């Protein structure tokens, strides 16, 4: 979830937003709810994908209900590409949903990425905030 938050913060910053906004209820709070709630349609979509369902299968199974993450994935993929913002989770999610990439292959690609600073420059404030609140960003170093 923290890597996802880092992607969201990078995109928000590229649009001129304060990246700390992403650490609030509308950002991280919503991300926690959508990732952990058994009532989340987005989580349900992810679980179905992990079990091998296709987007067409999922659409039928949702029975007219909307999982907003599907459309959001398509939109953010195009927007991030246009702005040159690195969003590897969003990119892999797009490939799984719309290009049929196997979930295991997408996960492997994400986990095999070279370790680096998730947030730098003005975005480092988000990283520091997460550390102060006890949320790890995958970087074990103490805040500067």
State the predicted function of each range.
Residues 2, 13-23, 27, 31-144:
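NAD(P)-dependent Rossmann-like dehydrogenase/reductase catalytic/cofactor-binding core
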């Amino acid at each position: 979830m923290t890597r996802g938050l880092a992607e969201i913060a990078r995109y928000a910053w590229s649009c001129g937003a304060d990246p700390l906004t992403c650490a609030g209820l509308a950002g991280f709070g919503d991300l926690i709810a959508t990732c952990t709630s058994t009532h989340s349609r987005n989580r349900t979509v992810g679980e179905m994908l992990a079990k091998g369902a296709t987007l067409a299968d999922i659409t039928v199974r949702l029975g007219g209900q909307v999982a907003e993450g599907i459309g959001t994935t398509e939109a953010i993929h195009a927007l991030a590409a246009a702005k040159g913002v690195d969003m590897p989770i969003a990119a892999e999610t797009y490939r799984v949903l719309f290009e049929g990439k196997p979930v295991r292959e997408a996960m492997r690609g994400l986990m095999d990425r070279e370790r680096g600073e998730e947030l730098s420059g003005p975005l480092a404030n988000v990283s520091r905030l997460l550390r102060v609140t006890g949320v790890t960003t995958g970087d074990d170093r103490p805040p500067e």
